[in-house]
């Protein structure tokens, strides 16, 4: 008899969870990373840097998993109260929209994307003529 050939691609084993990360949080991070076409490792690196995967983190005026300023979230379309940014999905929706702009300016470099996310990238986007692409100006 001929050997049976499987047409199912092998499954890659799931990466272990990061400290403080839950399976539910992993699912949310992956969903929003994919939604904004961002590399998942970049988003996890940012979550580790900003809050060690803690959606309820607060540091001065910064809120949530990715430590976004309410004013920055508002510039990305957020209309809630600052405390709403302590919800992981809400934080990811607006912070990753911001990270998407930083990623577009990073030339594919994770460290550069995080640098632009942390310090802001309006003037760089303006210099490159990318205000619309980065979400900083309506098209």
Q: What does each model-found stretch correspond to?
A:
Residues 1-8, 19-24, 79, 83-86, ...:
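Non-catalytic cell-wall polysaccharide-engagement segments
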Residues 12-48:
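Export/targeting segments at the very N-terminus of extracytoplasmic proteins
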Residues 38-54, 95-96, 117-118:
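Short, functionally critical alpha-helical segments immediately adjacent to catalytic or ligand/cofactor-binding
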Residues 51-54, 72-75, 120-123:
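Solvent-exposed loop/turn segments at secondary-structure junctions
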Residues 57-59:
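A short gly/proline-enriched turn/hairpin at secondary-structure junctions
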Residues 61-78:
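Substrate-binding/active-site groove segments that recognize
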Residues 61-64, 84-88:
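A glycine-rich, coil/turn loop motif that links secondary-structure elements
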């Amino acid at each position: 008899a001929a050997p049976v050939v499987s047409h199912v691609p092998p499954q890659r084993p799931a990466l272990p969870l990061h400290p403080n990360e839950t399976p539910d949080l992993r699912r949310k991070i992956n969903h929003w990373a994919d939604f904004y076409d961002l590399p998942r490792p970049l988003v996890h690196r940012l979550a580790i840097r900003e809050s060690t995967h803690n959606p309820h983190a607060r540091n001065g005026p910064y809120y949530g998993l990715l430590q976004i300023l309410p004013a920055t979230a508002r510039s990305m379309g957020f209309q809630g109260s600052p405390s709403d940014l302590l919800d992981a999905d809400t934080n990811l929706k607006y912070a990753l929209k911001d990270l998407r702009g930083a990623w577009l300016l990073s030339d594919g470099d994770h460290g550069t994307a995080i640098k632009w996310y942390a310090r802001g990238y309006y003037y760089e986007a303006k210099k490159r003529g990318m205000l619309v692409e980065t979400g900083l100006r309506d098209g």
